[in-house]
Amino acid sequence: TSDGSLLFLQHLISKMEPDGSRIGIVFNGSPLFTGDAGGGESEIRKWIIENDWLETIVQLPDRMFFNTGITTYLWIVTNKKSSKRKGKIQLINGTSFFKSMRKNLGAKGKEISKENQQEIIKAYLNFEENEISQIHENTFFCYTKVVVEQPLIEDGDIKTNKDGNPKPD
């Protein structure tokens, strides 16, 4: 993998208690979006989803950290989902739950107030679809990479390899 975040999450998962544990970890967008199907990152995400450990992802406001303005995500991972959460992943849009700081601290210009925290926690605990919460079956996040190739054409002829199969363009 090109990003160690998912490797670290694998390590945390390996430390979960068999009777049930919950992990909360903040990531940038990289663990969500990097890696082609069949690649390292994609395979780790697949492993987490197939084992039904990913419970919730909360998209946090940007500009929450001192040294960067990037958007971050709170992942909640557990090996003991409640029956209503089994086979499902909740996505919470927490980007509007912040208060602006009077004075920026580097790139940090926003913070989540206690009231904002309670709104996000309420969305998590209610586990209902609404304007900030989506609930999807685990299979919603599975995909297969498909590559469509065109044959290599030179001077109007399809070029073939030694086996007689068309060479890809």
Model-derived features: where do they sit?
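A conserved structural/catalytic subdomain of Rossmann-like adenosyl-cofactor enzymes
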Residues: 1-169
